[in-house]
Design a protein with these regions (language model features):
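Positively charged, small/polar-rich N-terminal and surface patches that mediate targeting and assembly
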Residues: 1-117
Length: 117
């Protein structure tokens, strides 16, 4: 299976938490890049219409790293039911996909490989 680019979309309740999660997953090389901005969300929750400010977060990674990234987002997320949506990238430039792949090779795999030398 070819390694392709994906975007994992989630929302967080604060800029501080979005930033902290972004730094953790980029440092762990679970994704190459994270973008986030403030949004207004209107949604139904337990029979009530909610109207809240949140931060939408776009995690850019590869199909091979997506499963581990999503598990880490779930682990770090404060919501009972976090939004975690995987979108496939299309028409991605070769240089961008190469960069994305190189920067999304999570450290655990690299450390195991280096430890075997």
């Amino acid at each position: 299976m070819a390694n392709t680019g994906v975007i994992i979309v989630s929302t967080f309740p604060s800029e501080e938490l979005a930033s902290r999660v972004a730094h953790l997953v980029v440092s762990a090389k679970l994704c190459a890049c994270v973008n986030f901005t403030k949004i207004r969300s209107i949604y139904s929750w337990h029979g009530k219409v909610e109207d809240q400010h949140e931060f939408i977060v776009l995690f850019k990674t590869t199909s091979k790293s997506a499963k581990k990234l999503k598990a880490e987002i779930v682990r770090l997320h404060p919501y009972e039911v976090p939004e975690i949506v995987e979108l496939k990238m299309s028409d991605v430039s070769k240089p961008y996909l190469s960069w994305l792949t190189e920067e999304s090779m999570y450290r655990i795999a690299k450390n195991r490989h280096n430890a075997a030398k």
